[in-house]
Amino acid sequence: MTGQERRQQLLDIGRRLFAERGFEGTSIEEIAAQAGVSKPVVYEHFGGKEGLYAVVVDREVERLSSMTTVLFEAPHSRPKFEAATVQLLRYIEDNADGFRILVRDSSPGAEGGTYGTLLADIAGQVEYIMADFLKSRGRDPKLAPMYSRMMVGMVAFTGQWWLDARKPRLEQVAANLIDLAWNGLSQLDAQA
């Protein structure tokens, strides 16, 4: 096995174990044993468990962050929100271990930590869409930061629940999220 292949093997094993047991519940010994190598091999590639975990988390953040570009591909607010909602749920469906690592010991509303920072970044992108939407409804666009966090939090928290429930189908969860958010937004009172 080449050095690059070994590194990827250790990343794959670490990702799975961190998702199952968390950072504290995973040991270098277990990672090395499952890879069929000695502990020094793990240290050689990553410097330790912290280094391996950091690379795993960075890759998941990068993977999820790259999906937020859909926010700017659709021409109108509702299609943008629909696309972003479906993308997040697809990420969860296709990368359950990675999402578990990101949300473990995290709160969707907290802006500290990797997951919270990622959600804050996404909410920042949603602010521009939300400001335009609020303006079109006669609302103060300065409320966009609050509304964007409401929207992102609603999707993120539902995504955490759906990660374990897996019912109803992804498309149905997305449709219901969009229905709740959009119909609620479409009825905003300009005076509130």
Positions of PLM-derived features:
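Short coil/turn segments at alpha/beta junctions that flank glycine-rich nucleotide-binding fingerprints
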Residues: 20-24, 95, 137
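Hydrophobic alpha-helical connector segments
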Residues: 55, 69-96, 148-151
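Amphipathic alpha-helical segments used for helix-helix packing
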Residues: 91-113, 127-131, 157-164
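Short, structured helix-loop boundary elements
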Residues: 7-8, 28, 50, 54, ...
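Amphipathic alpha-helical packing segments from all-alpha helical-bundle domains
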Residues: 62-65, 111-135, 145-149, 172-175, ...
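N-terminal intrinsically disordered/low-complexity leader segments
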Residues: 1-5, 141, 189-192
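Helix-turn-helix
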Residues: 9, 13, 17-51, 55
